[in-house]
Design a protein with these regions (language model features):
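Hydrophobic faces of well-ordered beta-strands that scaffold small-molecule active sites
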Residues: 1-3, 32-36, 74-79
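Short helix-capping and hinge/turn segments at secondary-structure transitions, especially at repeat
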Residues: 1-2, 7, 14
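Active-site beta-loop-alpha junctions enriched in small/polar residues
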Residues: 6-10, 37-41, 79-83
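Gly/Pro-rich active-site loop or hairpin
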Residues: 11-72
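C-terminal helical cap(s) of enzyme catalytic domains, especially alpha/beta-barrels
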Residues: 84-98
Length: 98
């Protein structure tokens, strides 16, 4: 299955759920792909949303843990499209983690 880290964080933020507890209840041993980006928070509503922001260090370290703990993961997708320089930097950083 595909685990979208930002979607999980958005759900946890908006529903006030502990992220680690939520994540640990998923069948991550069946995950083959991870989507990587950082979520945003809407200023008016205060709700989190999948903003496809540049993946921050917290997200990258979480990805590193997931890759280490779940050997079924084969594919990583950085969901960031705003500028090529930051996309290249995030791809380089992800490669360093694996």
């Amino acid at each position: 299955f595909l685990f979208d880290l930002s979607h999980a964080r958005v759900t946890c933020y908006n529903k006030n759920i502990n992220f680690d507890r939520y994540k640990n209840n998923l069948p991550l041993d069946r995950a083959i792909q991870l989507h990587i980006c950082t979520f945003g928070i809407d200023k008016e509503s205060g709700l989190a949303y999948d903003a496809h922001n540049y993946p921050n260090e917290e997200e990258l370290l979480e990805i590193q843990k997931l890759i280490k703990n779940y050997k079924s993961i084969e594919y990583l997708t950085v969901e960031y499209y705003r500028d090529i320089e930051n996309l290249e930097a995030s791809l380089k950083r992800v490669r360093e983690l694996v």
